[in-house]
Amino acid sequence: PELAAVALSADAGYFGSTPQACVHYLARQVHALGQAGDVLLLMTVSGNEASLLDAIEAAHERDLIVVALTGHTGGAVAAKMREMDVLVCVPHERPARVREAHTLLIHCLCDGIDVQLLGEQEL
């Protein structure tokens, strides 16, 4: 079965002449595209980007579940998470190691979704 996924973008068209436009570009996309029950997947090393924090607030306003892959302690993102959200902190401070772990986690997540939708494959 098909499973829709949309990559939110930092397209230059979202940036206006004000600094606020740079912060709110992800939240505006979440408001426009997100529906209750959807999942917002975030990947961040520091967990302190204002645009991501704003996107989490927008997701909660629209009743989305937030899955956040972060580095170290999760930063400010960790504080924004709700009970139904999922926070996975990679306990490392080097950005390259955190991103490598995020890549592995995304592959595992995709495999898990495939199993849920399609069942176990015979080897």
What are these regions (language model features)?
Residues 1-122:
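Glycine-rich phosphate-binding loops that contact phosphosugars or nucleotide phosphates
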